[in-house]
Amino acid sequence: MNRIFPEQLNHHLAQGLARVYLLQGQDPLLLSETEDTICQVANLQGFDEKNTIQVDSQTDWAQLIESCQSIGLFFSKQILSLNLPENFTALLQKNLQELISVLHKDVLLILQVAKLAKGIEKQTWFITLNQYEPNTILINCQTPTVENLPRWVKNRTKAMGLDADNEAIQQLCYSYENNLLALKQALQLLDLLYPDHKLNYNRVISVVEQSSIFTPFQWIDALLVGKANRAKRILKGLQAEDVQPVILLRTLQRELFTLLELTKPQQRIVTTEKLPIQQIKTEFDRLKIWQNRRPLFLSAIQRLTYQTLYEIIQELANIERLAKQEFSDEVWIKLADLSVKICL
C-alpha cells in the first residue's frame, strides 16, 4: 500500500485517481481538505454522486454491499465515503472485507479511521485492500508533530504565495500548534492584510494578538513576561471558550519544567535566590528553544526563584485534583490567583 502525506496528494492525483483511499488521522483540517481534493478530481472523471456513511452498529451492510454491486449497471459512478469506528470488531472486519471484495471501477472508496492500531494491518480486510495495489493509497492525516510543523507551515505559506521568514514561521507554529484550522484562517487573513505577501514576526503577532479567540499559548506568554492583567484577561477568554482547565494546567506544567531544565544548577543553590542564567544560550540551543521565545523565558528566569517554582508546581497539582473532582468556577479563580503569583 502506497503511503503519502496530504501535501503530496496533488502530485499523486496528477498521475491518476486511485481506487481506494484510506485516510488515517484525526486532524479536522487535513481530513476535510484531503477528502475534498480527492472528490474534486473524481467529479471531473464522472464520479458525480457521493454517499457518506458514519459506520456504527446500525449500519445496513447488506444494503450497502448490494448498492455497490448495482452501481455501474443501473447508476452512475459513485464515491463511497465510510467513517470507521476505532473498535474493529470481528463483524466489522467481515463486512469490510466483503465490501472491498465487490468493489469495481465505478466505485471510488474513501475510508476514514482515527488510527491504525497495532495488528490492523494483519486483518483480512486490510490485506484484501492490497489486491488493488498500486491503486490503494494511505494518507497520513495526523496533525504534524512539533518537530514537523515548521516544515508544514513553510510548505503551506509557499503554496499560498506567501513569503514568510523563519521568525514568522516559528510564531505561527507556536500560536497555532494542534490547531491547523485556526492556522489556515490566520494565513488567509495575513494574505488579505498584506498585499506584498511578506510575513515577518511583527505582522504575524499582530494578527495573533487581535484574534478574538484566545489560545493557551497566549496565556503562557503573558505569564512568562509577568503581565498579570493580560494573563487574567486571556484566562477569562479561555473560560468563555470552554477550554478545559486540565489543558491549561498541562501546558503550563510543560513550560515550568522547561524553565527548570534551562536553569539546572551545576552546584548547590539557595532556593530563595533568582534562577541562574549561566550558560543560558547553550541551554537554549540544547533544548531547541525558538529565538522569538527566548526573551520570554529570560524574563521569567530573571523574576522567579526555585522556591516560587516549586510552590507553583505544587499548586498546579492541587488545582488539577480540584478540576477532576468538580466543574466549578473555583478552578478558574485559583488559576487566576496562580497567574498573579507567577507574574510577581
UniProtKB/Swiss-Prot annotation:
Entry GO terms, CC: DNA polymerase III complex
Enzyme class, spelled out: transferase
UniProt KW keywords: DNA replication, DNA-directed DNA polymerase, Nucleotidyltransferase, Transferase
GO annotation (BP), single: DNA-templated DNA replication
Top-rank taxon: Bacteria
Pfam families: DNA_pol3_delt_C, DNA_pol3_delta
Keyword Ribosomal protein applies: no
InterPro entries referenced in this protein's UniProt entry, alphabetically: DNA_pol3_clamp-load_cplx_C, DNA_pol3_delt_C, DNA_pol3_delta_N, DNA_polIII_delta, P-loop_NTPase
Catalysis: reaction(s): DNA(n) + a 2'-deoxyribonucleoside 5'-triphosphate = DNA(n+1) + diphosphate
EC number: 2.7.7.7
GO MF entry, a single one: DNA binding
Biological function: DNA polymerase III is a complex, multichain enzyme responsible for most of the replicative synthesis in bacteria. This DNA polymerase also exhibits 3' to 5' exonuclease activity. The delta subunit seems to interact with the gamma subunit to transfer the beta subunit on the DNA.
Family note: Belongs to the DNA polymerase HolA subunit family.
NCBIfam families in the cross-refs: holA
Subunit (UniProt): DNA polymerase III contains a core (composed of alpha, epsilon and theta chains) that associates with a tau subunit. This core dimerizes to form the POLIII' complex. PolIII' associates with the gamma complex (composed of gamma, delta, delta', psi and chi chains) and with the beta chain to form the complete DNA polymerase III complex.
Protein name in UniProt: DNA polymerase III subunit delta
Lineage, highest ranks first: Bacteria, Pseudomonadati, Pseudomonadota, Gammaproteobacteria, Pasteurellales
Gene: holA
